[in-house]
Amino acid sequence: LHWPERKTNFFGRLNYKHKEEDSWNDFEKVLTALEKFIKQGKIRCIGLSNETPWGLTKFLEISKIKNLPRIASIQNPYNLLNRTHEVGLAEISVREKSGLLAYSPLASGYLSGKYRNGQMPKNSRMDYFLNFGQDIEHLMLKKL
């Protein structure tokens, strides 16, 4: 599953503000739908992407209570510049045996060295998506 359905912080957005009317609580409904795909042989297991510690915990809790499929993995960013997985998700992943599939291991290419000294190689990701490079990883790399 890619992106939580509920309102939460994505891509480094800070200052989470909870509003009761934004509450989303369809964890069981989602797991039940995915269970049907497993029984039909269309998928073997399920994972989450860009999920928070609370969201992963909630999916695991509902799957245990309702005897529904467990979350096998979480796919979130993890690299030398973005270590947010370690602040809550790492412990849950280990204790609940829900593996990490790290994406952006080279910090969108910044750790490869190709953007060093302001270089912008033609046909690179940052050449195509100019605003994409204005994220936290880019700012942190400048300090190295």
Placement of each model-derived feature along the sequence:
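Beta/alpha (TIM)-barrel catalytic core signal, keyed to glycine-rich beta->alpha loops juxtaposed to Asp/Glu
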Residues: P4-L144
